[in-house]
Amino acid sequence: MPRDRLKELQEKATVNTIHAYNYDPPARKYDVESQPLINQDADFEMFLERCSNIRGGLKSLEEDYDAVVQLHGALLSTPGADSENSNKLKSHNQMFFSKAEQIKNSLKILSEETSRIPTTACGIMRAKSDQVKSIYKTFENIMLNFNREQDEYKEKAKRKIVDYLKIRNMQLSDEEIENAVSSGNLSEVTKGVMLALNEKKALYDEVKSRADELKNLERQMGELAQMFHDLHIMVVSQAKMVDSIVNSVENATEYAKQARGNVEEARNLQKRARKMKVCIIIGSIIAVLILILFIQSAVCHFTPIC
């Protein structure tokens, strides 16, 4: 009985179709180890964004500094105790120190991250270092201006206290006023000012208000001194890192010059080798020709062929 070839071909076609639908292509091999853990471009963009945020904080810090300067002028020009402006001054000073501390910590983190960049990425390292250095400079200028303003206000407030005390014919030296303010015993020194009359009481209140402001200034000056100390340490660390970058760039330049010299020397050696090879070939050809001539002359001499 002949086989049904048509039915057999249909069955094979059905099997091939099923295999085609069930075919699972092999997964593409992906070498994870060869891929970088950090995208350098994305990392640098994030770094610039953080620098931009810190610059925004510096702008806010400068606004607080301007407000402190205006309040100092208002307090020095206002007769009598001004509790409202004194409270505003205290609030702005607290905000200034709080923001300055945050900026200092952020700069410290950026500086540490920059120092951990491998020396092979000199371009990125230098760009980040320049950004941090610029922010450091701006921050340092704001802090120096604030410190200078605090010193000037302290001296003006002390002179105003002396002027008030002179009204009651109380002569105190700068050292006595300094000790009274720092110890909080100004009331003992100026107790002669406190009389029954309302005018004298107001005068005493103003002197005491100025003294309280000076006490706050003394405390803030101590905080400023500590902050400047920390800032100096970070600037020194940043300078060392910049020196390291410069040394790396100089070493890379020296290596490049040395490599260029090696390449030129290799080219010269290659030229010499070619010349030597040509000379050897020419010499070999000449030697072969001489040998042929010698053999020919010898054959002609010893045989009657020639």
UniProtKB/Swiss-Prot annotation:
It is found in: Cell membrane. Expressed in body wall, pharyngeal, vulval and enteric muscles and in some head neurons. GO terms for molecular function: SNAP receptor activity; SNARE binding. It comes from Caenorhabditis elegans. Belongs to the syntaxin family. Residues 1-279 are cytoplasmic. The keyword Cell membrane applies. It holds the Pfam family Syntaxin. One of its GO terms (biological process) is synaptic vesicle docking. The lineage of its organism: Eukaryota, Metazoa, Ecdysozoa, Nematoda, Chromadorea. GO terms for cellular component: endomembrane system; plasma membrane; presynapse; SNARE complex. InterPro entries: SNARE, Syntaxin, Syntaxin/epimorphin_CS, Syntaxin_N, T_SNARE_dom. Residues 40-180 are annotated as: Required for the regulation of the defecation motor program. Potentially involved in docking of synaptic vesicles at presynaptic active zones. Acts in the intestine to regulate anterior body muscle contractions (aBOC) and the expulsion steps during the defecation motor program (DMP). Its main location: membrane. Keywords: Cell membrane, Coiled coil, Membrane, Neurotransmitter transport, Transmembrane, Transmembrane helix, Transport. It is a single-pass type IV membrane protein. Residues 301-306 are extracellular. Residues 204-266 form the t-SNARE coiled-coil homology domain. SUPFAM superfamilies: t-snare proteins. This is Putative syntaxin-3. The chain crosses the membrane at residues 280-300.
